């Protein structure tokens, strides 16, 4: 194994040398022969969890001896630990909820937004006057019907396409007539495996034509700087762009100091949204990760992200029992407030739905250019805000 250690992530290599665990959940990158590799994994009596053919990856739970054996195969290029990503928005109690409002004729009608999050609760604002949850897939607990045991995904869905029916339009989404395809890849604690997220991304891209998905909203952060993992995300982002999609991510929740931005937020083929506090006089949100990163403006722009009001979820509700669909209980309080850069990512996702409704032929570069030229700089350093905040009057027809 020592002669082949260049195929191993250094952290995994250390764990193996130290005999830390009996099993390891890993991502295996193959340059070819993925099916034969999976057959070999099965013959070693190990479990295969995911196969993401778009990026030639397999996720499996392997023993140390199985890892040793697999390293001998020339088609296997690299093996790394399957780490976690984290949602970056927190529920807070506040009497000063900020709502996202747009007063334009565009509503995102017919435009699909793919979301990888903690799920979506069947909230009235997403079901009335029509059901905006076009598809729900659960990669955590494998349930068949919408639910959200964390609340984050429901909140983001409301920011994008909530109808506002429970608040007489006060807390409607930015693109209220758009629809969502929600994949639950994050558990009730707001953690999700990288492999599940990659598989979710591939699923949304592959089914984008069926649901007219134009935007993929990824309201989470990856805190590591693993070049291999980032290369997998970058390949999938490129695939999304080739199909006319745009990927939106938050800048993350590190302190708003120079060079604090990490993970997928640094990639050039996605739109990265930071956050600012708009509750009083504008100021940068304390936990909005900042650039610069290489020669890029990251984040690309910022959006309000403090005390934002949107949909609440009954996190105790489970949508099925023994294969039978269960219906959600009545909830008295329909809305709550969150703070975090994921709110900004959801807002920009909704704005992009409006842009696609107006012109279905836009590509990633078009969207990024439109957002950039329609933004105003605030009185912050550029590494905190990129191009600044969106001026909707300049952006929307």
Show where each model-derived region lies.
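Subtilisin-like serine protease catalytic core
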Residues: 103-113, 119-134, 144-194, 214, ...
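C-terminal subdomain of the subtilisin-like protease fold in secreted/lumenal serine endopeptidases
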Residues: 213-217, 357-397
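Short glycine/serine- and small hydrophobic-enriched flexible loop segments
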Residues: 161-162, 202-203, 349-357
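Extracellular S/T/G-rich loop segment that most often corresponds to the catalytic His/Ser-adjacent loop
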Residues: 265-353
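Short glycine-/aliphatic-rich beta-strand segments at the starts of folded cytosolic domains
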Residues: 12-30
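Autoinhibitory propeptides
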Residues: 1-13, 35-98, 102, 386
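Gly/Ser-rich catalytic serine loop of serine hydrolases
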Residues: 143-154, 336-346
